[in-house]
Amino acid sequence: MRWRFSTLEIILLLLVVAGSGMAYAWVVYGGGGLIGATYALFMCMPILAFERHIIFRRLYRRIHGSPTPAFLLSSLAVYFIFVNVGYAAAGLLLHVAGVMRESRTDAMLPSLNVLVYALATSGPIIFVLRVRELLGRDVFLSLLTGRYRKPVQEERVFLFIDLAGSTSLAERFGDLRMQEYLGKLFAAMADPVLRYGGSIDDYVGDAAVITWPYDRAVADAACIRCVFDILEQIEADAHRWQKDYGEVPRLRAALHGGTIVAAEIGVDKHKITYFGDTVNTTARLEGLCRTLNRQVLISADLLRRLRPPVFVRAEDLGEHEVKGRGQKLAVLSLTAGSLSGDGATEPAGETVRSPAAEAFTSL
């Protein structure tokens, strides 16, 4: 699991934790800000790293898969251990460095007040991070700053990615097992989406809606790379899917971009939502995957504005009627480059010609 923060967010997090330690030292002891900051970082950062799946990932998954009472008790026990070990490590470091005048034992054993402080400091930070994770980074920051209090028109790219054969899987697995299956599938998408600067806007049944600002999506074909990274990750873990569920996910994906209107809606529950033909067209394009028997489709409008990765082949499928759209949509299929029959590699990043392919000669 990748570290899910930007460099600026990491710096701010460190400053908040260190600042709280300095404040505690000044209030309780009347000084020693550096010592307080050191203790705070050593005690709180392991807890935050654990909550962000950076350390002890298996233990984290096991705890979060437990019933609520066991989850609460186990979490508190882990936090208690982290605080004590962190305090002891900080105390030993400060004592060896000659900063602490107390005995080594006193420097390494936390008082009850210190334990309460550590949990009181970590708790609100963990709460904010969980809200951030629930909403997504971009949505969290947009809601926090009120960016979309008034409707804003902007250009975005959307990726609709859907699980093929979900109905038969649900009948075979049952509701609970199917939800677990979908949960792991969506979790597998998280890292590629973050890696390529996207954000998961919503989950609709067995489908995920992923979006980027237009410039970010077309830069180095990030939106296309994201799709194939997701597919590659599923394929790489095929043995695990087969072992755990007896079924490897088969996905369909559609990419399209254009002008939309973004707005913050709701009173008791707020949400940033996107309106416009672009969103509807992407959803219809994903439906064409089934009709055309293709795994990944992209609109010609979007493909014109980016350069596909060298490992991707684009096959022109012509123009197709899209429900709710007044004009036909030019569509292409994307596949990872493969070997032809004579062992030669297909021209990567090029469009396979068909009568309507001339529009893409500039790619």
Swiss-Prot record:
Cofactor(s) listed: Mg(2+)
Record text on cofactor binding: Binds 1 Mg(2+) ion per subunit.
EC number: 4.6.1.1
Matching CDD domains: CHD
One GO term of the biological process aspect: intracellular signal transduction
UniProt region (Disordered), positions on chain: 341-363
Domain of life: Bacteria
Keywords: ATP-binding, cAMP biosynthesis, Lyase, Magnesium, Metal-binding, Nucleotide-binding
Annotated Guanylate cyclase domain residues: 157-286
Molecular function as annotated in GO: adenylate cyclase activity; ATP binding; metal ion binding
Reactions that this protein is recorded to catalyse: ATP = 3',5'-cyclic AMP + diphosphate
Chain sites annotated for binding Mg(2+): D162, D206
This protein's record includes keyword Flavoprotein: no
Record keyword Membrane present: no
Function, in words: Plays essential roles in regulation of cellular metabolism by catalyzing the synthesis of a second messenger, cAMP.
Family classification: Belongs to the adenylyl cyclase class-3 family.
Record-given protein name: Adenylate cyclase 2
